[in-house]
């Protein structure tokens, strides 16, 4: 019984006894059939025949020479042998010796393979020659040159080795990255298609399923059958693609075609192809033949990867390649190599190998070819030795293939992620042409290479100007942390905002601690990303220090305390995200991330010590909220805090600070798209609770300050001194506000008055802040303006320019604002004191905040300065600029009669008309993005309703309308409870007010447009806190109020309403009875809150009415039924 032949790699041991050859008793003896057996096993044979193929051994075993080529591979000492004397003569003996020497030299290339035989063949077995070359070389080494059959085999092995050498040289001259694309292009050029390993296999099996029983189907029916079966698993399957697969089988002659007159032909599968193995082999053979026709030389391992997606079909593909080889294919390959050398210039002088290759190509490979002569044998083996030496020399010294693989292509993410197929299956179908890393070493190597790359183009023109004007953008980056720009190609920047995939990911902390909370890392969405399917990228890898194109703040953050205080050591770095960065894909408009900060009360004053100030916290970009359970229309609700980088930053990473402040608007606002509706659980809690409540951290987006670069050069001056509110004195408010009425006692009235005075003093101090000494920001082109302030619907096409330049409103400085207020007040109702002035410190602070808001809002334009009179060009509130004309409303002063005995205070409508324009009480064409800040006593609830109204001109959904109606009902119920506490007189006063409000509500109102201008107030947090203190004061002084004062207050409200009837456009104010408690008593600090409360609180009611009116239903009855709305602080 024949012995099973061993694997070709086990050529150093006897296939019978499996013992390694040696020079003593187990000398390797090669037979004429190509098998090599040790001398001991050969002597034990019962008959002189090969134990594997039973080939007769014609020569005496004792006369067969030892295979010295194998002995040198096992490291044995080659014994001196008696020179073999051939019967044909001495000349033939010389030829034999020369041929034997050639084989021994070629066998040395198998030395790395032999050294690894004990541990198995793995990646550490590095050899200059490829595996096909090694395999053919092993065949040559096993040939017995003494026997005639051995010489025939040696000549065929030499020819095969030479042909493979030509193929290797051609492979060295072709681009492996383009190999697969060229192959499939050649396949498609012939009307065929390969759908991928998995899909192609399924398609072939379905074809076999339809035709294996010998049935004849038309092409159309066959294609439809396959497509219908493939669709559940492969939705991309189409009739066209499957038709191309059938065409591939048709070219392979797998069908027996029956033609029919005036009808489609019927196809029947040939009997020899009615098994999957036979059909697949013919299918693969057709693809290999197409590649050969196209002049492509593809290795068997590459074929296995391309057609099967693994490395287990190399021998299958090799057999197909060998079967398709013809005697003419060798000469054709030599011609192709000549053409390739002409194209490259032949730097290695490979043309010298051409005569040897032609000699090998002329060898007859047929089995019945005559045996070669000794001279032909010598010439053939010398030629193959020269050719193989030339290949090895080219690979070692002139090959560009290895260097090409070291250089990543133009795509910056080349091999920076692990290959998914390699991780999951252990093999990659793309082989060397795969653009993903196949090992951790390769991954780290290319990531390091990419870190040294500089972005190929700046993020925007404005960022280039940062460097042109010499601003210190690069020195801001610390040595310890940098931005990973290498793995991300900077895309084009529409409208100056970095689009999805932007290279900028994080601004660098100034400190030495590049800490980064893991919860701040953006989540990578695989279905939106074009990166590798493997591990997600680390967006915060270190990057070069020379990144000057980052949109960083060129101005250092000023100290956060008074200038006379000693500076505190900064122990926490400032982490910011530049404006232009996109941590999230552009399509990710409906996913919001959770605020990483801990839970904290929303408005509880932090227990800071007086005289201390705190380090700014790291600011992160756009933390979006969890997906809503019940979506609401309109933009998401946003917390309103000052956008100033210097103003409202409280370090949220200190464990000792329980208070967190939500941001004013999304820090990373992308103005090019409309944000989806959100379900505001916290807003519903606001509506249900009449008292301020704390906000859970999950609903509080992280605060992000506004980048200063976004402003024009005219805004070079902004406060460098800290806001007084940052020095937060201790305010002993023990019980924090909660969602339910707190059982703990409230602060005393004296404490509330004292705290109010402190806040008023801090608001007053803001007036004297001097401009900073550093240089102004550079003039940025309009394309880089952050577009939060523009209509989102217009931003996509860039149509907001018309709104910017077509209208003008001189509302950007203190001079013009007061001038307009004075001019408007003169022809209208005159105040009791006869002059328009701000009698209250709080009113001044509010006015300054509003002016600061307007200045910041309109400075997104790049118009020239327009001086007015002899006033300074740039006021302390910034430069005069242009914005929409409709921002100015000539509604006249809104005046209320002050209580008797209280200081007279006038309130100009210009002080509040900005809110009408911004919030939707007038004909403003702009829509705020739900981030209108509070002014004075403007409360968060007010802005929530404004956010609801600001639906960008889109009708509110039914859920929003029901929510608004429910809110009004709840507020009316709370109002009725509050009014019952005041007694019969308060009830009667409320009825009088109700009748008056109903009369006003019956008047026609101007058409409402959605508000579109978001406001920003730097002192907003102080205003909120002041509002809380005043609410407490109102509650404490409610029992002490005088009945006659209540009457006076009611008269003042009626007088205000009458002003609107006397020719003034009614500002749609509805007075909220619950907040009348704030005005029923004298307020400390020499002012009464009656007038402001009437106007401010009534604006909330009008915003609610606008929210319902914007539906188109005009349902105002709910809000007009009582004329009051709850004043719950957010």
From Swiss-Prot:
Residues bearing the modification Phosphoserine: 462, 531, 535, 861, 1107, 1110
Traits of the deletion mutant: Mutant animals are born at Mendelian ratio, but die within 6 hours after birth. They displayed a curly tail and malformations of the caudal spinal column. Lethality can be rescued by changing the genetic background from C57BL/6 to outbred CD1, which allows about 4% of the animals to survive to adulthood. These animals display enlarged spleens with a trend toward increased numbers of eosinophils and monocytic/macrophage populations, dramatic and selective expansion of CD8(+) effector-like T-cells.
Listed pathway(s): Protein modification; protein ubiquitination
Zinc finger annotations (RING-type) as residue ranges: 14-54
Example GO molecular function: zinc ion binding
Effect in UniProt of substituting residue 14 to A: No effect on localization to stress granules
HEPN-C: region residues: 327-399
Mutagenesis or variant effect for residue 199 to R: In sanroque; partial loss of ICOS regulation, no effect on localization to stress granules, no effect on RNA-binding
Catalytic activity: S-ubiquitinyl-[E2 ubiquitin-conjugating enzyme]-L-cysteine + [acceptor protein]-L-lysine = [E2 ubiquitin-conjugating enzyme]-L-cysteine + N(6)-ubiquitinyl-[acceptor protein]-L-lysine
Subunit and partners: Interacts with DDX6 and EDC4. Interacts with CCR4-NOT deadenylase complex. Interacts with RC3H1; the interaction is RNA independent.
Function: Post-transcriptional repressor of mRNAs containing a conserved stem loop motif, called constitutive decay element (CDE), which is often located in the 3'-UTR, as in HMGXB3, ICOS, IER3, NFKBID, NFKBIZ, PPP1R10, TNF, TNFRSF4 and in many more mRNAs. Cleaves translationally inactive mRNAs harboring a stem-loop (SL), often located in their 3'-UTRs, during the early phase of inflammation in a helicase UPF1-independent manner. Binds to CDE and promotes mRNA deadenylation and degradation. This process does not involve miRNAs.
Miscellaneous comment text of the record: Treatment of C57BL/6 males with ethylnitrosourea led to the identification of the sanroque mouse strain. Homozygous sanroque mice develop high titers of autoantibodies and display excessive numbers of follicular helper T-cells and germinal centers with pattern of pathology consistent with lupus. Sanroque mice reproducibly develop intestinal inflammation in the small intestine but not the colon.
Protein name: Roquin-1
UniProt lineage: Eukaryota, Metazoa, Chordata, Craniata, Vertebrata
């Amino acid at each position: 019984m024949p012995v099973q032949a061993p694997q070709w790699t086990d050529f150093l041991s006897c296939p019978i006894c499996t013992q390694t050859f040696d020079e003593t008793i187990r000398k390797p003896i090669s037979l004429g059939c190509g098998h090599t057996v040790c001398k001991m096993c050969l002597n034990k044979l019962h008959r002189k025949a090969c134990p594997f193929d039973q080939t007769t051994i014609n020569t005496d075993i004792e006369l067969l020479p030892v295979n010295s080529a194998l002995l040198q591979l096992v490291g044995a000492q080659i014994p001196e042998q008696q020179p073999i004397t051939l019967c044909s003569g001495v000349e033939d003996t010389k030829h034999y010796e020369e041929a034997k020497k050639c084989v021994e030299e070629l066998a040395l290339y198998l030395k790395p393979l032999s050294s690894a035989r004990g541990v198995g063949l793995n990646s550490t077995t590095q050899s200059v020659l490829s595996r096909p070359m090694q395999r053919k070389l092993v065949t040559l080494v096993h040939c017995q040159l003494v026997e005639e059959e051995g010489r025939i085999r040696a000549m065929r092995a030499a020819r095969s080795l030479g042909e493979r050498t030509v193929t290797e040289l051609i492979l060295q001259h072709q681009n492996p990255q383009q190999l697969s694309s060229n192959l499939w292009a050649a396949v498609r050029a012939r009307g065929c298609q390969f759908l991928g390993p998995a899909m192609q296999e399924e398609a072939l099996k379905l074809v076999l399923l339809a035709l294996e029983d010998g049935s004849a189907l038309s092409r159309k029916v066959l294609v439809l059958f396959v497509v219908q079966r493939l669709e559940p698993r492969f939705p991309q399957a189409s009739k066209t693609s499957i038709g191309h697969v059938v065409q591939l089988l048709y070219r392979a002659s797998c069908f027996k075609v029956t033609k029919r007159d005036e009808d489609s032909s019927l196809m029947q599968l040939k009997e020899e192809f009615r098994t999957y193995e036979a059909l697949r082999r013919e299918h693969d053979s057709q693809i290999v033949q197409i590649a050969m026709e196209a002049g492509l030389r593809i290795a068997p391992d590459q074929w296995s990867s391309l057609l099967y997606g693994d490395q287990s079909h190399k021998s299958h593909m090799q057999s197909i390649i060998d079967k398709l080889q013809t005697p003419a294919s060798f000469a054709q390959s030599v011609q192709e190599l000549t053409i390739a050398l002409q194209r490259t210039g032949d730097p290695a002088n490979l043309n010298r190998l051409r005569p040897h290759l032609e000699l090998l190509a002329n060898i007859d490979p047929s089995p019945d070819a005559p045996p070669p002569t000794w001279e032909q044998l010598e010439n053939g083996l010398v030629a193959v030795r020269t050719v193989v030496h030339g290949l090895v020399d080219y690979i070692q010294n002139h090959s560009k293939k290895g260097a090409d693989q070291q250089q990543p292509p133009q795509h910056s993410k080349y091999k920076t992620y692990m290959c998914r197929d390699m991780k999951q299956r252990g093999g990659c179908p793309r082989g060397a042409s795969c653009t993903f890393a196949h090992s951790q070493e390769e991954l780290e190597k290319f990531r390091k290479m990419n870190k040294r790359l500089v972005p190929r183009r700046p993020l925007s023109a404005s960022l280039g100007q940062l460097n042109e004007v010499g601003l210190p953008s690069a020195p801001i980056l610390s040595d310890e942390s940098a931005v990973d720009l290498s793995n991300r190609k900077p895309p084009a920047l529409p409208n100056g905002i970095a689009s999805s995939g932007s290279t900028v990911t994080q601004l660098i902390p100034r400190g030495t601690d590049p800490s980064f909370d893991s919860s701040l890392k953006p989540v990578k969405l695989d279905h939106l990303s074009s990166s590798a399917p493997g591990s997600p990228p680390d967006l915060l890898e270190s990057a070069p220090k020379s990144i000057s194109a980052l949109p960083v703040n060129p101005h250092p953050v000023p100290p956060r305390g008074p200038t006379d205080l000693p500076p505190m050591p900064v122990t926490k770095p400032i982490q910011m995200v530049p404006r232009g960065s996109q941590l999230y894909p552009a399509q990710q408009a409906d996913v919001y991330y959770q605020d990483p900060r801990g839970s904290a009360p929303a408005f509880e004053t932090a227990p800071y010590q007086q005289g201390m100030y705190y380090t700014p916290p790291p600011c992160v970009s756009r933390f979006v909220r969890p997906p809503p359970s019940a979506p609401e229309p309109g933009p998401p609700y946003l917390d309103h805090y000052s956008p100033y980088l210097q103003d409202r930053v409280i370090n949220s990473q200190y464990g000792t600070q329980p208070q967190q402040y939500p941001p004013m608007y999304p820090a990373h606002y992308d103005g090019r798209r409309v944000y989806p509706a959100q379900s505001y659980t916290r807003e519903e809690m606001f509506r249900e609770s009449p008292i301020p409540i704390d906000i859970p951290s999950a609903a509080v987006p992280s605060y992000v300050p506004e980048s200063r670069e976004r402003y024009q050069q005219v805004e070079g001056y902004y406060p460098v001194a800290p806001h007084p509110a940052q020095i937060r004195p201790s305010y002993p408010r023990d019980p924090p506000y909660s969602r339910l009425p707190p059982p703990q006692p409230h602060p005393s009235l004296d404490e509330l008055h004292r705290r109010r005075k402190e806040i008023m003093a801090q608001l007053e101090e803001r007036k004297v802040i001097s401009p900073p000494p550093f240089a102004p920001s550079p003039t940025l082109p309009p394309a880089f303006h952050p577009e939060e302030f523009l209509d989102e619907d217009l931003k996509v096409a860039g149509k907001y320019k018309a709104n910017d330049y077509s209208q003008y409103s001189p509302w950007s400085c203190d001079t013009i604002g007061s001038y307009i207020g004075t001019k408007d007040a003169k022809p209208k109702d005159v105040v009791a004191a006869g002059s328009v002035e701000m009698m209250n410190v709080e009113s001044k602070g509010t006015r300054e905040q509003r002016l600061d808001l307007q200045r910041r809002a309109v400075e997104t334009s790049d118009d020239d300065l327009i001086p007015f009179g002899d006033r300074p060009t740039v006021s302390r509130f910034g430069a005069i600029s242009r914005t929409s004309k409709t921002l100015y409303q000539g509604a006249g002063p809104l005046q209320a009669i002050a209580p008797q005995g209280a200081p007279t205070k006038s309130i100009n409508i210009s002080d509040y008309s900005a809110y009408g324009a911004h919030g939707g009480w007038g004909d403003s064409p702009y829509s705020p993005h739900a981030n209108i800040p509070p002014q004075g006593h403007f409360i968060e609830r007010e802005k929530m309703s404004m956010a609801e109204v600001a639906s960008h001109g889109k009708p509110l959904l039914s859920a929003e309308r029901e929510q608004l109606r429910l809110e009004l009902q709840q507020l009316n119920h709370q109002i009725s409870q509050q009014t019952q506490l005041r007694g019969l007189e308060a009830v009667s006063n409320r009825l009088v007010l109700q009748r008056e409000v109903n009369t006003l509500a019956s008047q026609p109102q101007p058409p409402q447009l959605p508000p579109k201008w978001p406001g920003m107030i730097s002192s907003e947090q102080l205003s909120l806190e002041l509002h809380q203190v005043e609410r407490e004061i109102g509650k404490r002084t409610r029992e002490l109020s005088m009945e006659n004062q209540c009457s006076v207050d009611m008269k003042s409200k009626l007088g205000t309403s009458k002003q609107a009837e006397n020719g003034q456009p009614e500002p749609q104010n509805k007075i909220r009875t619950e907040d009348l408690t704030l005005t029923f008593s004298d307020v400390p600090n020499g002012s009464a809150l009656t007038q402001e409360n009437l106007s401010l609180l009534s604006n909330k009611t009008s915003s609610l009415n606008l929210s319902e009116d914007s539906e188109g239903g005009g349902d105002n009855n709910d809000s007009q039924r009582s004329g009051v709305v709850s004043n719950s602080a957010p």
